[in-house]
Structure formats: C-alpha cells, structure tokens
Amino acid sequence: MVRPVQVGNKTRMSFAKIDEVLQMPDLIEVQKKSYKWFLEEGLREVFREISPIESFTGNLALEFVDYRLENNPKYSVEECKDRDTTYAVPMKVKVRLTNRETGEIKESEVFMGDFPLMTEKGTFIINGAERVIVSQLVRSPGVYYEQQFDKFGKKLISATVIPNRGAWLEYEEDSNDIVYVRIDRTRKVPITVLLRALGYSTDIQILDLLGEEEKLKATLDKDTTKSEEEALIEIYKRLRPGEPPTVESAKSLLYALFFDAKRYDLAKVGRYKFNKKLALKARIANLKSAKKIVNPVTGEILVEEGEKISKEKAEEIQNCGINVVEVLVEGKVVKVIGNNTVDINKYPMPYDVSSLNIKEAVNLSILKEILDNFSDEEAVINEIKNRMDELVPKHITKDDIIATISYQLNLTHGIGSIDDIDHLGNRRLRSVGELLQNQFRIGLARLERVVKERMTIQDVNEITPQNLINIRPVVAAIREFFGSSQLSQFMDQTNPLAELTHKRRVSALGPGGLSRERAGFEVRDVHYSHYGRICPIETPEGPNIGLIGSLTTYARVNEYGFIEAPYRRVDKTTGTVTDEIVYMTADEEDEYIIAQANEPLDENNRFINEKVVCRLKEEIIAVPPTEVDFMDVSPKQIVSVATSMIPFLENDDANRALMGSNMQRQAVPLIKPEAPIIGTGIEYKAAVDSGVVVLAKNDGVVEKVAADKVVIRTKDGRRDEYNLLKFKRSNQGTCINQRPIVNEGDEVKKGQVICDGPSTDHGELALGKNVLVGFMLWEGYNYEDAILISEELVRDDSLTSIHIEEYDAEARDTKLGPEEITREIPNVGEDALKDLDERGIIRIGAEVTAGDILVGKVTPKGETELTAEERLLRAIFGEKAREVRDTSLRVPHGESGIVVDVKVYSRENGDELPPGVNQMVRVFVAQKRKISVGDKMAGRHGNKGVISRILPVEDMPFLPDGTPLQICLNPLGVPSRMNIGQVLEVHLGLVAKALGWQIATPVFDGATEEDIQELLAKSGFSPDGKVQLYDGRTGEPFDNKVTVGYMYMLKLHHLVDDKMHARSTGPYSLVTQQPLGGKAQFGGQRFGEMEVWALEAYGAAHTLQEILTVKSDDVSGRVKTYEAIVKGENIPEPGIPESFKVLVKELQSLALDVKVITEDNQEIPLKEFEDDDDSDVPDATLNINIEGREDTPPEEVYEEGYEEGFEEESEELPEDIDFEPDSFDIENDDLDLEDFDI
C-alpha cells in the first residue's frame, strides 16, 4: 500500500510496489560522455588517420604528433552569453616536419583555432546563443540482406554492403537465377565478374571457391568475361564510362575503391557488424555437418559427419581457424564460407595476449603470418600491436566480399537470416563526439590539400610547419557545423524539462540521415526493439512524427553507438531473479526471454506465478519460470523522462499521452512554482539533471545567504561561493531566476539542492499549479475544450509568469559618417526623453510602452548640393550642424514592460564588436503576464484548452463548505479522448489535499482504482469522488453531483499577448507592393480568393474595390487616400493595382503586348516608374519601405507628373509620416493633427 519515500528534502507518499534495483543514470550523460570521448580519443584518431602528410615528391613529411586544449576559456559561460562570443578554448597541435633528403626535423606547436567547449549542462555557447547538438539515428554500416518476390511469387534475395564512407556494393538476383553486383551505384554486372577481378579468374576456381551452386552456374553462363583482365576492364567501363580502359588503371581503381583505408572506411562499428553477420558461428549453428570437422591446431574431432552443430561447437569451429564448413540442407551439400576472422582471446595462441585487450575479431591470415615469423612472446605481442590496422582492418577485405557472396547464395537454402533495417540492432546513434569528429575530418582533409600544395611551391629550406598549415578550413568546418548544421539546434529553454528532453533527443533527419519527404511509414513506426531504448510515446505531431524520438530513462549508448537497455539476470538453475544488471543491445536481446518488471516475486526473488508472461522478439509468450533469462529493471524503462512524469499514464490513450509529453515541455515557468501534489517520483531527478538547480559541491555549513549568492563553509574551512542567476532571459524569452532554499546555519550534504531554479520547487520539477477543478459545464463557456477560470487565479498571481525581451541598438559607421547614440534627437519632444540618461540610454526601472525610445540614435543624412550663398555663409560662420535623422531604438508594437537591465559595449572600452560597429546597447525589458482570456492551458494528459472567460470568485460554483472552484473543465473532453488518467488524478488529488500528502504514483506501477476508492472512503468523501456543488450566482444546488478535485494545470507558451496583432499601414512587398504577412513583419491580414468570393456574393462592390486597391497595392492611390483621411477630405478614385502592372510585365516578357481599354475604346496608360529616383516613389510620402525606415525626403522624389493628385494648398508635402504615425508635421492651418492616431 502507501509508504513514505524521501525525495530530496521532501517526503512523498509512494504507491510503488516495485523496488528500484538500479539507480537512474545521469540523464545528460549521452552528451557529456560523447564529447569527452571526442576530446580524448576522437581527435587523436583523426590526426592519426591523416598524418603523415607527404609532399608529391615524397621528400617532405608533416606529422601531427600530439595536441592539447588549453584549460582556461577566455570568458565564463555567462560572459560569453552577454558578449555574443563562443565559449571555447584554443587548441594547440604539436607538429613535426621532416625533410627526408637532409634528415632535418623541425618541431613546433601550431595554433589550430578555438574549439567550442561543452558546458556543465551538456550545451555549447555559440556566438552567445546556447545550442544543443542532437544525436542522429542512422543506419549502421554493415551487410544487409532483404528479400522480394517477383511477379510469379519467386523469392529474390538482394544485399547491400554499406560502409561508413566509401563505395557501396549491392547484390541482386533476377528471375533467371542470375546474381548481379552493382559497384558504387553504377550499372550492374554479373557477380562472377567481380570474383574474377579479385583473382578467381576461371570458372573452375569460382565453383571450387563457392561450391556447385545453381545460381552460380547460371551467372557464369551469363558472364561474357573469361579472365581477370577482361573482368577488370568490364568493371572499369562501368565505373568510368568514356575513359580508355587499361588493366593497370582498372586494378588501381578497384584497389582504391575498396582496399584503401583513406577511401573506404567501415569504422569500428562497421567492422563489428561485418564480423557479427559473416562469422561462421551464427550461420552454421543448428545445421548438420556434411563432413567431419577437425580442429586444425590440435587435430581433435569437433563434429562427426551428419552430426548437428550446436551453438557452442559452432563458436569453437569459428575460433580455431576453420573458415569453410560444408553442411547438409535437405540432402544437398552447401558450402558456408566465413570472413576468416577469429576471436584472439579464444584462438589457441601459444602466448597470453589478454593484456592487449583486443575486443574485435582479428584477421586469421595476418595472425598466422605473425605467429609463423616470430617465436618469442614479446616480439609477437609487439608485432600484433604494430599491425593492429591489418589485424582489424578499417576497410573491407577480399575475405569479407567472398563471405558476403557466400551468405547471399546460402540464403537460397535457408541458411542465414534476412535483416530488418528498422531494428535498433541495425540503427545506431551518432552523438556529438562522432558528428564533430566527422566535421573535423573534413576540415583536416581540406587542410591536407593546402599543405601538399604549399610543400611544392615553397622553398624546401625555408619551410616551417607554421607557414605550411592554414587553419582556415579546419576552423570553417567546425564553425559551419555549430552554426548551420541541421543537428546543431538553438536550445529549447522554455523550462528545465524542455532543456533536458532536447539533450536526449534522437533524430533520424539531418546530413546522412532520412528526409521528411522520403521517410515512409515503416521507419516512423514503433518497433519492438524500441522497448527500453526509444520512447514509444514522445515524438512530435506533424511531418516529423516518428523521425524524432527521445531516449528512455534507463537507456545508454555503447561504444559502437547502439542503444542499450538494462535487465536483471535470472539465475535459471534456481529460478531466482538476481540483482546483477546486464546492458544489452537490441540484437543481443533478441536471443533471450525477458519478463516484465511488474511480474510478482516472493521474498526470495522467485517468480510466484506458474507461467510468467514474457517477451521474445516481438512475441508475448507465457513460459514456466525456469525458462526466463532476464527481467526488466523498472516499469519506467520503456518511456522517456517527459512521459514518465505523467501520473496514471497507463490509463491514457497513447495519442493523448503523446500530447501530454510534448505540452509539458511548453509550460512557462511561473512566479511561484508549486510541485505537483500528484507526482510520479521522477520530478527530483529531472530537475537535478537538467542543471537549473544549484547543488552543494561539498559537505558544510551555510555561512551566508543573499538573493544572489550563497556561501558555504566546508569541513576543512574553505569557503564555497555560489553565484545565482537573477532574472536572466532564456532562449525562449522566459525568465531564469534562482532562489536560495537554505538558511544560514543549515548543514548541507554534498549534492544537496541549495537553490531552486525556474520551474523548480525544493529541488523538484514544478511546471504548473495545483488547482481545484470541477468537470462541469457553465453557461457554454467550456464549449470545445474552452476553460473557465476564477478571478482568484489572476488576483493571487497563481498563473503569472515573467517574460523578458531583449532589444539591441548598434551605432555603425555609414558612408556619410558614424551613427551616434545620443539624447539630442531631432523633432522629439522632451516628454519622449524623460527616461533617457545623458548618453541617450533608458534608465533601469523605467516603464515603457509601444513606441517609447529605448536608445536615442541619430544617423547622418545625405548632404544636398549647396547654393553659392550657403557656401559663402558656411565659409564665414563655420560648419553648420550636419543633417541627421532619428533612427532611435523604440519599443515595437504591442510590447511593453519594465527595463530590467541595460548593457553597453563600445570599442573604446576594448569590447569585441562586429566590424563596422562602434557601440552596442542591449536593453532587457521584462513583462509580468497574468493569465488572460485567450491563453492556452493544459493538464498532463493531453487535455488542452483556451481560456474563454475569467469569472469573479463570487460567481464560481462552490463546494458545500463554501470553497469556490478555480477552474471548470468540460466533461465531454474525457470520454472520446480516452485520457482517463486525468479523472484518476483529480480523485487522488482531492484525497491528497485533504490528508495533506504529496503523492508519488509512478507510471505503470502507481495507485489503482481500488487504492483511490479506499482513500476516498477513509477521507470521508463519496466513493465515486463526486461532490454536490452550488451555483455561485444564485446559491442554488446544481442538479447533479460533480467530479471535483485537484489537477495539475500548466500555462503553455502560446500566450495571447504574443499573438495579438493589428496594422494600419506598414511595410510592403517589393515586387507586388502588397502588404507583407505575419506579426514578425508587421504585416496585414490576407484577403484571399475565397474571401473575395464572399464579398462578390453580397455584391459589396465598393468594399471589394478598396480592399483590392487602396488597402493593398494601388501605390499612388493608397498615398492619396492616406492624405485624404489625414486632411479630412473625400477619398479619391482608386488607381490601378501594382500587381496588375506586374501581370502585364510578365505577359510582355512572353512577347504578348497587353493594353487596357475602356468601354469607349480609350487606352488607359499604365504609368511606370522608370527613373532611378522614382524606384520607391509612393512610399516616400509615407516614408515606408521594407524596413519601415524613411529614406529620402519626399520633396526630392515627387517630380513632374506625381503631384497632380494633390490639392493646390498643400505646397508642403507631409514630411514625416512614418508607417505608424503618431504625429504629423503638416503645415496646414485649418487642421489640427495632434490627436490623429492611425
């Protein structure tokens, strides 16, 4: 039943029945571990691959000996964010240049650029922005066999040999039993051509090698080549059509394609997959031997003729150096050929080589050669070390190719297995480290070319390593990866869960992966091998569904990049579940029978049930306890972190659970975070691992606590200082604020939470608020999932969040002189400057609204030609003040708030600024947003809705004791959505609140319906959890009882303030001259084709005409209309829309001359702006262009022919109508324009 559990420094009442045998691992280990590997191993590997770089003549060689990263970054993480720089350290490489003619050696240390460092939280700071590198799920290198059926139902087998990089080999069969090969996606040739080219030139040799196979004979009949030379030339013609083929060039091409480690790379994982697939042990197990098999080293008979080969024997055969075994299948003798590798630790070696720690299988022929040539132990071990690259080759070998062909032929007889490419045994993760290593390799390959060229050009005696190496390509490759790769993403920082999930994300998209358009259903589907590795619930809705996933809670990634899941071993002899934990990849797991975590055990850890329900591959089976191999570690292991935070997940439909997981990531941090009453027990772990809380580094006593600093004196008398982040802006504009939760004099332990971050409450993740909800209708205000809330939530700031926006102003050098940040702004009243300091920068604490100046800035205007008199006056009285215009930074439309921080950077102070920028001011404006109508809220079960009305507290329905509800939800939102978890949460919440408990109900192992009913009865509630409610307006009881209780509700990032938008005039598109669209562009609302039909249907001709002309793209018409409105005159006739002129131009470009003719055959001239000056004409009066800046004063623009539309009296054209006019300077006596606001 319920038992108290300590979570951080809180106690929760847990309903868990299963004891956790394994601690959950560090949740961002994927990132950290991978990057650590890169710095320690990955870089070294790349340098080793590329060095030495030799000149074309071979007399110079450049080696990369060693590298080091300096350990002190120039700026701290926070400073990098402030200064827009990258958090990086310099990388120094030790380089040795050898002149082989003179024997001269020059060594020096070369700077190889700044290398971005990973922060403690597993992120990178690139140009001041925090970014995450997402792991990519790609197809693993290896050999894949698949089968199709032709139109007669005949089985055709095809194979693909995929390296990490290099040429693909593809085998395919046709209906006539001929086996073809494609090399590097070119035209196909019979497979025997490839065998001949590899040295098996005659038909007899080929049949001897692979056995008398029908398919082989058919292929040999089809094959026109008869010798190695002919075969090589045939292949060369396919690979290089149009080039004159020679045997030599064909040989070297084939060698370069497959057997050159620089061109063909299997990577460690490819070699592992090849050996696993092609090794004999997996292929001959459980088959009958056609001959007796003798151990070639000891002479011992392993298997008699006709005897079945057991798994153990198969492994022994493989590791004693036998590569070919003949087996009997339906009375036929079939040759099975391995790829000639053995496990060196199991091979009968004369010496002990376990000290070498070789995990991979090694090439037998090379191993034999070493053993034949060397006799004493030390020499053998040294030689093995030196020839490691040959023993475990990175490229494909002749043995591999023959083994793959043998496998293809064996499949006809049912020997071997078809591969499923969606199985996680065949897909692997490329994490940060590997992705970076690949980029670095590209950079170094470019560098290699440069070095080789410079070696030939420069004087041999003068050359130094420094002037050979140009680090640009390396730096560029790394910068390009971090800056613009699809996998380098701007971190989702809405709340701590969003951060954590982003770092654990797994994407099948990106370079070398799939594309959204090509990915079919199979790839996106949940696969049985995802169990315990990738969450079946958490994936985006929309085009990326199933292509982006999330790692499960206990998953980890092994050295080959395969995802492993943990299991407890079951001791089969006694039938006891042990506490030994085994991590297995998906293909290893396929061989075992695995029980679920919630299978009941007795006190001795033995299975209670006669039959245990287990998994075997995709089957669910019931077996006796003696057959079970493993057992799950925890019920949580199949879901991701976000999903495991949904209580009663087992009672929710998967589609809604998916929405619930995704919406928790969009919850906005509130002012007063509150941990859920009904949690799942994982909140603490998630908050701690997300890195937003502050943990004590050592045991000690708290000496000082301030809002922004905590000091702890440790046992050995040192003082640890912790500086807290106060009201910083996150990537998504939410507020990051840390608050101490310890007091002076408290004793703290190492690893204890001493400060809460955003959305955390005493070290637990707290994304929302516990509110009293009732499932009832109220006057139709909860129609279609709308939510009715009480004013109490607004008044108490329960759902209030702080949002911080950042605005930048830069003073640059222009052609006409430098811009200046100043308080002296032309045509601006003192009122607008009241909050600016003497530099023209707003003071901290000022309250600003849309249009207010944040930073005063002026830009020089173009000087007009001076008259002779003016020149004379200038000469006498000195320089007149330069003409300047106002380009101040203002608060954009619809924004307002309080200035919380101002940062000023200038060249004079030695700050690094972009070229051409002399000064930069950054202003942070914070807004306190209370919950309002139109905001989106959601529970954790995918139950989302928009707030429709905020009701006074006194009108809300109330409980018998007078407590008003805080939220009314629509009961119809439950049945069809099948997310019953929310109802159970509400019932349990009611009880928990009454008992004063905080509850943990873990997923798949939480409170049952019976538990809840028992508690309801114990707390004195009705067993159905329903309560009689009363109408707040009349005090009358409602007809029916209502389900009432506490639910955890989140306020999501879709806030109405960010979506409200209105425009009168604004920027226009350049070609069509129609208003832009979207809030970001300050655009208009699109009036599309169907809306036009609606107006046509009602015959609203004038409305329609003005929508299509003056409100859109009739350029001169809209200026005149604006003028007319401003002066209070009648609106003139509309002109011709610009888009019509564009159409005419397009028709003219097709050589069709188009004229517009009136009813009485008069041609209407289409005015065109051909003069250079007039390119931007009409907007000039409004001073509107795309950026919404004024460019040229109207007087210069309006020349002949454009003024005709204006009345005589306005000699002065409107000087300063901006596209958001607040004031006009039109000198017109009979019109006071002060109060116009359009």
Curated annotation (Swiss-Prot):
CDD domains: RNA_pol_B_RPB2 (cd00653)
Keywords of the record: DNA-directed RNA polymerase, Nucleotidyltransferase, Transcription, Transferase
EC number: 2.7.7.6
GO biological process, one term: DNA-templated transcription
Compositionally skewed regions (Acidic residues) per UniProt: 1193-1238
Gene3D superfamilies the UniProt entry points to: 2.40.50.100, 2.40.50.150, 3.90.1100.10, DNA-directed RNA polymerase, subunit 2, domain 6, RNA polymerase alpha subunit dimerisation domain, RNA polymerase Rpb2, domain 2
Region span, Disordered: 1186-1238
GO (cellular component) term, any one: DNA-directed RNA polymerase complex
Cross-referenced Pfam families: RNA_pol_Rpb2_1, RNA_pol_Rpb2_2, RNA_pol_Rpb2_3, RNA_pol_Rpb2_45, RNA_pol_Rpb2_6, RNA_pol_Rpb2_7
Catalytic activity: RNA(n) + a ribonucleoside 5'-triphosphate = RNA(n+1) + diphosphate
GO MF annotation list: DNA binding; DNA-directed RNA polymerase activity; ribonucleoside binding
HAMAP family per UniProt: RNApol_bact_RpoB
Subunit details: The RNAP catalytic core consists of 2 alpha, 1 beta, 1 beta' and 1 omega subunit. When a sigma factor is associated with the core the holoenzyme is formed, which can initiate transcription.
Family statement: Belongs to the RNA polymerase beta chain family.
Function: DNA-dependent RNA polymerase catalyzes the transcription of DNA into RNA using the four ribonucleoside triphosphates as substrates.
Protein name: DNA-directed RNA polymerase subunit beta
Gene: rpoB
